[in-house]
């Protein structure tokens, strides 16, 4: 009977949660420097994810005492982790077809370049959403256009990011 089916369960949703959790498990960051809370969309060409900045994060103490603002390097790191690393891990785990891009224990992503423009401040406790669209993934190098939005859906930052997968 259709009325007895649990609203929160659907085989596709369970499958996607497993994929997202597998990718999150492969992120090479510990909790104090992991800036990915949730992946809401993922394909071979695009990723959408979010992060909520903790009010007591270590970088707020000295970044404008009394009037803390999220440093641009942290905004850039959030964009890179969601927009480049998550998408790169997904491409590798799902067979990118590129030689030399297998994901093992001694493999880690490196940001090789970023060109970011900032439009709005991000304050402690704010939630941000990152959307990344792939330009290409060749020979272990991923290049994407990455945008960050605040909870009001205002553009916070936008940039072009490139990164590679390196063997340790």
Range-by-range predicted roles:
Residues 1-41, 45-47:
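N-terminal leader/capping segments at the start of a protein or of a new domain
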Residues 2, 8-17, 84-131:
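Hydrophobic beta-strand-centered segment that forms part of the acyl-chain substrate-binding groove
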Residues 2-16, 119-168:
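HotDog/MaoC-like acyl-thioester-processing domains
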Residues 24, 66-67, 117-120:
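Beta-strand-rich interaction surfaces with strong enrichment in secreted/lumenal proteins
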Residues 28-70, 74-75:
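Catalytic strand-loop segment that frames the active site of acyl-thioester-processing enzymes
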Residues 70, 75-89:
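Active-site- and interface-proximal helix/loop "cap" or "latch" segments in soluble metabolic
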């Amino acid at each position: 009977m259709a009325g007895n089916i649990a609203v929160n369960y659907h085989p596709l949703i369970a499958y996607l949660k497993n994929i997202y959790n597998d990718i999150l498990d492969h992120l090479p960051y510990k909790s104090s420097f992991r800036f990915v809370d949730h992946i809401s969309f993922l394909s071979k060409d695009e990723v959408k994810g979010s992060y909520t900045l903790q009010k007591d994060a270590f970088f707020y103490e000295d970044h404008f005492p009394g009037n803390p603002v999220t440093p641009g390097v942290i905004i850039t790191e959030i964009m890179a982790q969601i927009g480049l690393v998550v998408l790169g891990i997904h491409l590798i785990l799902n067979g990118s077809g590129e030689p030399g891009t297998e994901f093992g224990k001694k493999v880690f992503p490196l940001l090789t370049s970023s060109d970011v423009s900032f439009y709005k401040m991000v304050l402690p406790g704010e939630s941000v959403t990152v959307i990344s669209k792939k330009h290409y993934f060749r020979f272990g190098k991923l290049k994407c256009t990455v945008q960050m939005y605040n909870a009001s859906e205002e553009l916070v930052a936008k940039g072009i990011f490139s990164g590679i997968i390196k063997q340790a």
